[in-house]
Amino acid sequence: MAKIVVTGGAALHGEVSISGAKNAVLPILCATLLADEPVEITNVPHLHDVVTTVKLLGELGAKVTIDQGTLSRGSAIVVDPRSVNQHVAPYELVKTMRASILVLGPLLARFGAAEVSLPGGCAIGSRPVDQHIKGLQALGAEIVVENGFIKATAKRLKGGHFTFDMVSVTGTENVLMGAVLAEGTTILDNCAMEPEVTDLAHCLIALGAKIEGLGTARLVIEGVERLSGGRHEVLPDRIETGTFLVAAAMTGGKVTVNRARPNTMDAVLSKLVEAGAKIETTDDTITLDMQGKRPKAVNLTTAPYPAFPTDMQAQFMALNCVADGVGVINETIFENRFMHVNELLRLGADIQVEGHTAIVRGNEHLSGAPVMATDLRASASLILAGLMASGETTIDRIYHLDRGYENIEEKLSSLGATIRRVP
Protein backbone atom coordinates (compact mmCIF):
# COMPACT_ATOMS: atom_id res chain seq x y z
CA MET A 1 0.00 0.00 0.00
CA ALA A 2 1.41 3.42 -0.96
CA LYS A 3 2.79 5.78 1.66
CA ILE A 4 3.89 9.41 1.69
CA VAL A 5 7.27 10.36 3.17
CA VAL A 6 7.77 13.96 4.31
CA THR A 7 11.09 15.45 5.41
CA GLY A 8 10.52 18.54 7.52
CA GLY A 9 12.37 21.80 7.76
CA ALA A 10 11.62 23.79 4.59
CA ALA A 11 9.58 27.00 4.51
CA LEU A 12 7.12 26.94 1.60
CA HIS A 13 7.40 29.60 -1.11
CA GLY A 14 5.81 30.10 -4.51
CA GLU A 15 2.46 29.75 -6.24
CA VAL A 16 0.00 26.88 -6.48
CA SER A 17 -3.27 26.43 -8.41
CA ILE A 18 -6.37 25.16 -6.64
CA SER A 19 -8.42 22.29 -8.07
CA GLY A 20 -12.18 22.01 -8.39
CA ALA A 21 -14.05 21.36 -5.15
CA LYS A 22 -14.59 17.71 -4.19
CA ASN A 23 -17.72 18.58 -2.22
CA ALA A 24 -19.21 20.41 -5.21
CA VAL A 25 -18.28 18.09 -8.07
CA LEU A 26 -19.82 14.95 -6.52
CA PRO A 27 -23.39 16.31 -6.19
CA ILE A 28 -23.05 18.07 -9.56
CA LEU A 29 -22.12 14.79 -11.28
CA CYS A 30 -25.15 13.16 -9.64
CA ALA A 31 -27.34 16.08 -10.80
CA THR A 32 -26.62 15.21 -14.45
CA LEU A 33 -29.10 12.32 -13.99
CA LEU A 34 -31.88 14.92 -13.87
CA ALA A 35 -31.23 16.13 -17.42
CA ASP A 36 -32.52 14.61 -20.64
CA GLU A 37 -29.55 15.81 -22.73
CA PRO A 38 -25.74 15.64 -22.27
CA VAL A 39 -24.20 17.82 -19.54
CA GLU A 40 -20.57 19.02 -19.55
CA ILE A 41 -18.84 19.57 -16.19
CA THR A 42 -15.46 21.36 -16.25
CA ASN A 43 -12.70 21.95 -13.68
CA VAL A 44 -13.21 18.40 -12.40
CA PRO A 45 -10.38 17.31 -10.06
CA HIS A 46 -8.58 13.96 -10.40
CA LEU A 47 -9.84 12.33 -7.20
CA HIS A 48 -10.71 8.79 -6.17
CA ASP A 49 -14.24 9.87 -5.19
CA VAL A 50 -14.76 11.34 -8.68
CA VAL A 51 -13.68 8.03 -10.23
CA THR A 52 -16.15 6.21 -7.95
CA THR A 53 -18.98 8.59 -8.90
CA VAL A 54 -18.24 8.17 -12.61
CA LYS A 55 -18.32 4.38 -12.12
CA LEU A 56 -21.67 4.71 -10.35
CA LEU A 57 -23.13 6.80 -13.20
CA GLY A 58 -21.89 4.15 -15.63
CA GLU A 59 -23.51 1.37 -13.56
CA LEU A 60 -26.80 3.25 -13.85
CA GLY A 61 -26.43 3.27 -17.63
CA ALA A 62 -25.19 6.82 -18.26
CA LYS A 63 -22.55 7.34 -20.94
CA VAL A 64 -19.58 9.22 -19.46
CA THR A 65 -16.78 10.79 -21.52
CA ILE A 66 -13.68 12.20 -19.81
CA ASP A 67 -11.21 14.73 -21.22
CA GLN A 68 -8.24 14.39 -18.85
CA GLY A 69 -7.33 18.09 -18.93
CA THR A 70 -4.22 19.41 -17.15
CA LEU A 71 -3.07 19.69 -13.55
CA SER A 72 -3.94 23.38 -13.40
CA ARG A 73 -7.27 23.27 -15.20
CA GLY A 74 -8.84 19.97 -14.21
CA SER A 75 -10.75 17.60 -16.45
CA ALA A 76 -13.95 18.03 -18.41
CA ILE A 77 -16.55 15.28 -18.04
CA VAL A 78 -19.56 14.91 -20.32
CA VAL A 79 -22.42 12.82 -18.92
CA ASP A 80 -25.12 11.66 -21.31
CA PRO A 81 -28.00 10.47 -19.09
CA ARG A 82 -30.28 9.45 -21.96
CA SER A 83 -29.13 5.83 -21.70
CA VAL A 84 -29.80 5.46 -17.95
CA ASN A 85 -31.64 2.15 -17.47
CA GLN A 86 -30.89 1.19 -13.86
CA HIS A 87 -32.21 2.76 -10.66
CA VAL A 88 -30.16 0.78 -8.12
CA ALA A 89 -26.92 2.12 -6.61
CA PRO A 90 -25.05 -1.05 -5.57
CA TYR A 91 -23.46 -1.61 -2.16
CA GLU A 92 -20.02 -2.27 -3.72
CA LEU A 93 -19.77 1.38 -4.82
CA VAL A 94 -21.81 3.10 -2.13
CA LYS A 95 -19.87 1.48 0.72
CA THR A 96 -16.68 3.27 -0.34
CA MET A 97 -18.19 6.75 -0.58
CA ARG A 98 -21.02 8.34 1.37
CA ALA A 99 -21.75 10.85 -1.40
CA SER A 100 -23.25 8.01 -3.46
CA ILE A 101 -26.51 8.70 -1.63
CA LEU A 102 -26.76 11.84 -3.79
CA VAL A 103 -28.20 9.79 -6.66
CA LEU A 104 -31.33 9.17 -4.56
CA GLY A 105 -33.07 12.50 -5.26
CA PRO A 106 -32.17 12.67 -8.98
CA LEU A 107 -33.19 9.06 -9.75
CA LEU A 108 -36.45 9.45 -7.86
CA ALA A 109 -37.32 12.78 -9.52
CA ARG A 110 -36.38 11.73 -13.04
CA PHE A 111 -37.41 8.06 -13.15
CA GLY A 112 -39.85 7.65 -10.26
CA ALA A 113 -37.81 4.98 -8.50
CA ALA A 114 -34.48 4.64 -6.70
CA GLU A 115 -32.70 2.06 -4.57
CA VAL A 116 -29.55 3.21 -2.82
CA SER A 117 -27.50 1.16 -0.40
CA LEU A 118 -26.99 2.78 3.00
CA PRO A 119 -23.70 4.66 2.69
CA GLY A 120 -20.13 4.05 3.87
CA GLY A 121 -17.16 6.39 3.33
CA CYS A 122 -15.24 8.24 6.05
CA ALA A 123 -15.33 6.75 9.54
CA ILE A 124 -16.52 10.02 11.08
CA GLY A 125 -19.48 9.53 13.38
CA SER A 126 -22.90 8.29 12.39
CA ARG A 127 -23.87 10.98 9.82
CA PRO A 128 -27.54 9.95 9.68
CA VAL A 129 -29.42 9.93 6.37
CA ASP A 130 -32.82 10.58 7.93
CA GLN A 131 -32.90 14.18 6.67
CA HIS A 132 -32.67 12.94 3.06
CA ILE A 133 -35.54 10.52 3.64
CA LYS A 134 -37.81 12.93 5.53
CA GLY A 135 -37.27 15.68 2.95
CA LEU A 136 -38.14 13.47 -0.03
CA GLN A 137 -41.15 12.05 1.85
CA ALA A 138 -42.36 15.64 2.29
CA LEU A 139 -42.39 15.83 -1.53
CA GLY A 140 -44.59 12.73 -1.76
CA ALA A 141 -42.03 9.94 -2.03
CA GLU A 142 -42.80 6.54 -0.56
CA ILE A 143 -39.62 5.30 1.12
CA VAL A 144 -38.75 2.17 3.06
CA VAL A 145 -35.38 1.11 4.45
CA GLU A 146 -34.89 -2.66 4.28
CA ASN A 147 -32.05 -5.12 3.75
CA GLY A 148 -29.53 -2.28 3.90
CA PHE A 149 -31.17 -0.32 1.06
CA ILE A 150 -33.19 2.89 0.88
CA LYS A 151 -36.02 2.06 -1.54
CA ALA A 152 -37.97 5.03 -2.87
CA THR A 153 -40.83 5.41 -5.35
CA ALA A 154 -42.98 8.30 -6.57
CA LYS A 155 -45.14 8.81 -9.66
CA ARG A 156 -44.08 12.46 -9.71
CA LEU A 157 -42.79 14.34 -6.72
CA LYS A 158 -45.06 17.16 -5.52
CA GLY A 159 -43.92 20.52 -4.21
CA GLY A 160 -44.07 20.91 -0.46
CA HIS A 161 -42.69 22.77 2.57
CA PHE A 162 -39.94 21.05 4.52
CA THR A 163 -37.75 22.26 7.38
CA PHE A 164 -34.56 20.31 8.04
CA ASP A 165 -34.25 19.21 11.68
CA MET A 166 -30.53 19.88 11.48
CA VAL A 167 -28.27 21.51 8.92
CA SER A 168 -27.27 18.80 6.44
CA VAL A 169 -25.22 19.57 3.34
CA THR A 170 -25.96 16.36 1.44
CA GLY A 171 -29.52 16.33 2.77
CA THR A 172 -30.10 19.82 1.36
CA GLU A 173 -28.57 18.76 -1.96
CA ASN A 174 -30.62 15.57 -2.31
CA VAL A 175 -33.96 17.22 -1.53
CA LEU A 176 -33.10 20.23 -3.73
CA MET A 177 -32.39 17.90 -6.66
CA GLY A 178 -35.66 16.08 -6.04
CA ALA A 179 -37.59 19.35 -5.93
CA VAL A 180 -36.40 20.79 -9.26
CA LEU A 181 -38.57 18.32 -11.24
CA ALA A 182 -41.43 18.22 -8.72
CA GLU A 183 -44.89 19.50 -9.60
CA GLY A 184 -45.43 22.93 -8.05
CA THR A 185 -43.42 25.01 -5.58
CA THR A 186 -41.15 23.64 -2.87
CA ILE A 187 -39.92 25.68 0.10
CA LEU A 188 -36.93 24.26 2.01
CA ASP A 189 -35.98 25.85 5.35
CA ASN A 190 -32.88 25.47 7.53
CA CYS A 191 -30.90 24.58 4.42
CA ALA A 192 -27.13 24.24 4.43
CA MET A 193 -25.60 27.48 3.08
CA GLU A 194 -22.22 26.04 2.05
CA PRO A 195 -20.74 27.41 -1.21
CA GLU A 196 -20.84 23.89 -2.63
CA VAL A 197 -24.64 23.80 -2.22
CA THR A 198 -24.84 27.15 -4.01
CA ASP A 199 -22.59 25.81 -6.78
CA LEU A 200 -24.93 22.85 -7.26
CA ALA A 201 -27.86 25.27 -7.48
CA HIS A 202 -26.01 27.33 -10.12
CA CYS A 203 -25.46 24.14 -12.14
CA LEU A 204 -29.15 23.18 -11.88
CA ILE A 205 -30.17 26.69 -12.96
CA ALA A 206 -27.85 26.39 -15.98
CA LEU A 207 -29.82 23.27 -16.95
CA GLY A 208 -33.18 25.06 -16.62
CA ALA A 209 -34.14 24.74 -12.93
CA LYS A 210 -35.89 27.62 -11.14
CA ILE A 211 -34.33 28.20 -7.71
CA GLU A 212 -34.36 31.30 -5.50
CA GLY A 213 -32.60 32.06 -2.22
CA LEU A 214 -29.14 30.82 -3.20
CA GLY A 215 -26.69 31.12 -0.30
CA THR A 216 -29.47 31.49 2.30
CA ALA A 217 -31.16 29.07 4.69
CA ARG A 218 -34.40 29.17 2.64
CA LEU A 219 -34.49 27.77 -0.89
CA VAL A 220 -37.61 28.21 -3.03
CA ILE A 221 -37.85 25.87 -6.01
CA GLU A 222 -40.42 26.17 -8.78
CA GLY A 223 -40.62 22.71 -10.33
CA VAL A 224 -40.10 22.37 -14.08
CA GLU A 225 -41.10 19.60 -16.51
CA ARG A 226 -37.55 18.83 -17.64
CA LEU A 227 -33.91 19.86 -17.41
CA SER A 228 -31.95 20.21 -20.63
CA GLY A 229 -28.24 19.82 -21.30
CA GLY A 230 -25.70 22.50 -20.49
CA ARG A 231 -22.26 23.29 -19.12
CA HIS A 232 -20.99 24.16 -15.64
CA GLU A 233 -17.55 24.91 -14.19
CA VAL A 234 -16.98 23.54 -10.67
CA LEU A 235 -15.96 26.17 -8.12
CA PRO A 236 -12.46 26.00 -6.52
CA ASP A 237 -11.95 23.84 -3.44
CA ARG A 238 -11.92 26.04 -0.33
CA ILE A 239 -10.62 23.20 1.86
CA GLU A 240 -7.65 22.55 -0.44
CA THR A 241 -7.09 26.32 -0.48
CA GLY A 242 -7.10 26.45 3.31
CA THR A 243 -4.78 23.45 3.59
CA PHE A 244 -2.08 25.12 1.48
CA LEU A 245 -2.46 28.40 3.37
CA VAL A 246 -2.04 26.59 6.71
CA ALA A 247 1.05 24.83 5.32
CA ALA A 248 2.56 28.21 4.42
CA ALA A 249 1.68 29.67 7.83
CA MET A 250 3.12 26.72 9.78
CA THR A 251 6.41 26.69 7.89
CA GLY A 252 6.97 30.45 8.01
CA GLY A 253 6.68 30.79 4.26
CA LYS A 254 4.99 32.94 1.64
CA VAL A 255 2.58 31.31 -0.79
CA THR A 256 0.07 32.56 -3.37
CA VAL A 257 -2.87 30.30 -4.19
CA ASN A 258 -4.33 30.90 -7.65
CA ARG A 259 -7.78 29.98 -8.98
CA ALA A 260 -9.16 30.38 -5.45
CA ARG A 261 -12.43 31.89 -4.22
CA PRO A 262 -11.50 34.17 -1.28
CA ASN A 263 -15.12 35.19 -0.66
CA THR A 264 -15.87 31.63 0.53
CA MET A 265 -12.96 31.64 3.00
CA ASP A 266 -13.78 34.35 5.58
CA ALA A 267 -13.75 32.15 8.70
CA VAL A 268 -10.48 30.43 7.75
CA LEU A 269 -8.71 33.62 6.65
CA SER A 270 -9.64 35.44 9.85
CA LYS A 271 -8.12 32.61 11.93
CA LEU A 272 -4.92 32.75 9.86
CA VAL A 273 -4.70 36.50 10.47
CA GLU A 274 -5.25 35.80 14.18
CA ALA A 275 -2.33 33.35 13.97
CA GLY A 276 -0.14 36.21 12.74
CA ALA A 277 -0.26 35.85 8.96
CA LYS A 278 -0.38 38.77 6.56
CA ILE A 279 -2.99 38.06 3.88
CA GLU A 280 -3.73 39.83 0.60
CA THR A 281 -6.56 38.81 -1.75
CA THR A 282 -7.80 39.52 -5.26
CA ASP A 283 -10.97 38.10 -6.82
CA ASP A 284 -9.28 34.73 -7.40
CA THR A 285 -5.96 34.71 -5.52
CA ILE A 286 -4.85 34.68 -1.88
CA THR A 287 -1.30 35.47 -0.78
CA LEU A 288 -0.23 34.50 2.74
CA ASP A 289 3.03 35.83 4.20
CA MET A 290 4.35 34.38 7.46
CA GLN A 291 8.06 34.80 6.74
CA GLY A 292 10.26 34.92 9.82
CA LYS A 293 7.38 34.32 12.23
CA ARG A 294 6.07 31.47 14.35
CA PRO A 295 2.27 31.20 14.30
CA LYS A 296 0.27 32.09 17.39
CA ALA A 297 -2.16 29.48 18.74
CA VAL A 298 -5.83 30.06 17.88
CA ASN A 299 -9.11 28.95 19.46
CA LEU A 300 -11.86 27.76 17.15
CA THR A 301 -15.27 26.10 17.11
CA THR A 302 -16.51 24.23 14.05
CA ALA A 303 -20.05 24.98 12.86
CA PRO A 304 -22.01 25.06 9.58
CA TYR A 305 -21.06 27.66 6.95
CA PRO A 306 -20.37 30.58 7.18
CA ALA A 307 -18.71 29.60 10.48
CA PHE A 308 -15.43 27.69 10.73
CA PRO A 309 -15.55 24.47 8.62
CA THR A 310 -15.11 21.08 10.26
CA ASP A 311 -13.05 20.05 7.22
CA MET A 312 -10.31 22.51 8.31
CA GLN A 313 -10.25 21.48 11.98
CA ALA A 314 -7.47 18.87 11.67
CA GLN A 315 -5.22 21.24 9.71
CA PHE A 316 -5.55 23.98 12.34
CA MET A 317 -4.85 21.43 15.05
CA ALA A 318 -1.56 20.72 13.27
CA LEU A 319 -0.87 24.47 13.21
CA ASN A 320 -1.60 24.74 16.94
CA CYS A 321 0.82 21.86 17.59
CA VAL A 322 3.75 24.09 16.55
CA ALA A 323 2.27 27.48 17.49
CA ASP A 324 3.19 29.80 20.33
CA GLY A 325 0.64 29.36 23.13
CA VAL A 326 -2.37 27.17 23.83
CA GLY A 327 -5.24 26.65 21.37
CA VAL A 328 -8.66 25.21 22.22
CA ILE A 329 -10.58 23.44 19.45
CA ASN A 330 -14.28 22.59 19.81
CA GLU A 331 -15.72 20.13 17.27
CA THR A 332 -19.52 20.48 17.06
CA ILE A 333 -20.29 18.86 13.68
CA PHE A 334 -19.07 15.25 13.73
CA GLU A 335 -18.33 12.64 16.36
CA ASN A 336 -14.98 10.83 16.20
CA ARG A 337 -13.29 13.74 14.47
CA PHE A 338 -10.21 13.73 16.69
CA MET A 339 -8.84 10.46 15.33
CA HIS A 340 -5.71 12.29 14.15
CA VAL A 341 -4.79 13.22 17.73
CA ASN A 342 -3.09 9.91 18.58
CA GLU A 343 -1.00 10.14 15.41
CA LEU A 344 0.02 13.76 16.11
CA LEU A 345 1.06 12.65 19.61
CA ARG A 346 3.50 10.20 17.98
CA LEU A 347 5.23 13.22 16.42
CA GLY A 348 5.62 14.90 19.81
CA ALA A 349 2.49 17.05 19.93
CA ASP A 350 0.94 18.03 23.28
CA ILE A 351 -2.84 17.52 23.00
CA GLN A 352 -5.50 16.72 25.58
CA VAL A 353 -8.96 15.65 24.45
CA GLU A 354 -11.99 16.15 26.67
CA GLY A 355 -15.17 15.07 24.89
CA HIS A 356 -15.65 17.31 21.85
CA THR A 357 -12.81 19.64 22.90
CA ALA A 358 -9.07 19.39 22.21
CA ILE A 359 -6.56 21.53 24.12
CA VAL A 360 -3.35 21.93 22.14
CA ARG A 361 -0.16 23.30 23.71
CA GLY A 362 2.27 24.51 21.10
CA ASN A 363 5.63 22.79 20.83
CA GLU A 364 8.31 24.36 18.67
CA HIS A 365 9.86 20.98 17.84
CA LEU A 366 8.14 17.88 16.44
CA SER A 367 10.01 14.69 15.52
CA GLY A 368 9.34 12.55 12.47
CA ALA A 369 7.77 9.12 13.01
CA PRO A 370 5.65 6.54 11.18
CA VAL A 371 1.97 7.53 11.39
CA MET A 372 -1.31 6.31 9.93
CA ALA A 373 -4.03 8.36 8.25
CA THR A 374 -7.51 7.64 9.64
CA ASP A 375 -9.61 9.81 7.32
CA LEU A 376 -9.28 12.39 4.57
CA ARG A 377 -8.59 15.58 6.54
CA ALA A 378 -6.57 13.75 9.21
CA SER A 379 -4.18 12.63 6.48
CA ALA A 380 -3.68 16.26 5.44
CA SER A 381 -2.95 17.29 9.04
CA LEU A 382 -0.25 14.62 9.31
CA ILE A 383 1.45 15.92 6.16
CA LEU A 384 1.35 19.45 7.60
CA ALA A 385 2.85 18.27 10.89
CA GLY A 386 5.47 16.33 8.94
CA LEU A 387 6.53 19.54 7.19
CA MET A 388 7.51 20.88 10.63
CA ALA A 389 9.00 17.70 12.13
CA SER A 390 12.71 16.96 12.20
CA GLY A 391 13.66 13.93 10.13
CA GLU A 392 11.22 11.80 8.14
CA THR A 393 7.52 11.30 8.73
CA THR A 394 6.02 8.32 6.90
CA ILE A 395 2.23 8.43 6.47
CA ASP A 396 0.45 5.14 5.82
CA ARG A 397 -3.07 4.60 4.43
CA ILE A 398 -2.87 7.62 2.15
CA TYR A 399 -5.71 6.30 0.02
CA HIS A 400 -7.78 8.58 2.25
CA LEU A 401 -5.79 11.53 0.88
CA ASP A 402 -6.50 10.62 -2.74
CA ARG A 403 -10.22 10.86 -2.04
CA GLY A 404 -9.99 14.64 -1.61
CA TYR A 405 -6.65 16.12 -2.69
CA GLU A 406 -5.44 16.23 -6.28
CA ASN A 407 -1.68 15.68 -6.66
CA ILE A 408 -0.93 17.08 -3.22
CA GLU A 409 2.67 15.85 -3.17
CA GLU A 410 3.45 17.44 -6.56
CA LYS A 411 1.87 20.71 -5.47
CA LEU A 412 3.74 20.79 -2.15
CA SER A 413 7.01 19.85 -3.90
CA SER A 414 6.56 22.80 -6.24
CA LEU A 415 6.49 25.04 -3.14
CA GLY A 416 9.75 23.60 -1.80
CA ALA A 417 8.55 20.75 0.42
CA THR A 418 10.52 17.51 0.51
CA ILE A 419 7.74 14.99 -0.01
CA ARG A 420 7.42 11.82 -2.04
CA ARG A 421 5.07 8.91 -2.55
CA VAL A 422 6.56 5.44 -2.10
CA PRO A 423 5.10 1.95 -2.71
From Swiss-Prot:
Q: Which keywords does this chain's UniProt record carry?
A: Cell cycle, Cell division, Cell shape, Cell wall biogenesis/degradation, Cytoplasm, Peptidoglycan synthesis, Pyruvate, Transferase
Q: What is its EC number?
A: 2.5.1.7
2-(S-cysteinyl)pyruvic acid O-phosphothioketal: modified positions:
122
Q: What class of enzyme is it?
A: transferase
Family, according to the entry, reads as follows:
Belongs to the EPSP synthase family. MurA subfamily.
Which function does this protein serve? Cell wall formation. Adds enolpyruvyl to UDP-N-acetylglucosamine.
Protein name, as recorded: UDP-N-acetylglucosamine 1-carboxyvinyltransferase
Q: Which organism is it from?
A: Stenotrophomonas maltophilia (strain R551-3)
